[in-house]
């Protein structure tokens, strides 16, 4: 082995040792396990603004949630992260949410995504994965809906879809959000 080959091999080995333990994916996994990441996209400023409001409300009502906004470059990134279980919650326009749910249009490559609605207004929906814990859905919906009744939350005009949403061709509500909307109790202390 000549000097050039040795130095190349040594450099490659050193790079591998230093870089192999610093995958941002692992840091993302830890971050999302300790924070509620509300996804938004830079290509929809309305959803981004609403996501910021939601995160601020949730941080105030549920400080342990560590609620934060995670911005993707396009709404397709939200579909990618939610469909693969790398994220649980996102703010999406109603047409985009329905297209994600059905696996249509720009979301065909992700297939039909099992989404549920936590809260919605006229233009946007706070969507989550179907397997988002019922307790978390209940607490999140409770925080947002109760804030809406305050003076500074009046402009949010939020609602929870009814049980018949799926029959009407819409995305069904999350089980925890529906329990809150119907005034049913849910064990919010159990689970994770």
Briefly describe each language-model feature range.
Residues 104-120:
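Short beta-strand->loop
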Residues 47-63:
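Short, polar/charged alpha-helical segment
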Residues 5-25:
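N-terminal export signals
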Residues 63-80:
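Short helix-initiation/N-cap motifs at beta->coil->alpha
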Residues 32-44:
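Short, well-ordered beta-strand elements
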Residues 152-192:
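An extracytoplasmic/periplasmic, membrane-proximal ligand-sensing/linker region
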Residues 40, 118-136:
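A bilobed periplasmic-binding-protein/Venus flytrap-type ligand-binding module shared by bacterial periplasmic
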Residues 87-109:
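A ligand-binding cleft/hinge motif common to bilobed small-molecule-binding domains
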């Amino acid at each position: 082995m000549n000097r050039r080959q040795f130095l190349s091999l040594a450099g490659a080995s050193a790079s591998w040792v230093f870089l192999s333990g610093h995958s941002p994916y692992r840091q993302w996994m830890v971050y999302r396990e300790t924070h509620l990441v509300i996804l938004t996209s830079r290509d929809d400023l309305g959803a981004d603004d609403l996501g910021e409001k939601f995160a601020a409300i949730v941080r105030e009502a549920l400080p342990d949630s560590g609620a934060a906004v995670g911005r993707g470059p396009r709404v397709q990134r939200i579909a990618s992260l939610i469909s693969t279980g790398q994220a649980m919650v996102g703010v999406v326009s109603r047409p985009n949410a329905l297209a994600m749910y059905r696996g249509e249009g720009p979301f065909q490559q992700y297939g039909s995504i099992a989404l549920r609605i936590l809260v919605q207004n006229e233009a946007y929906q706070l969507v989550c994965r179907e397997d988002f814990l019922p307790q978390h859905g209940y607490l999140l919906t409770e925080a947002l809906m109760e804030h809406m009744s305050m003076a500074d939350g009046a402009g949010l005009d939020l609602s929870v879809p009814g049980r018949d949403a799926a029959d009407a061709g819409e995305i069904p509500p999350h089980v925890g959000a529906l329990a809150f909307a119907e005034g049913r109790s849910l064990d919010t202390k159990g689970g994770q």
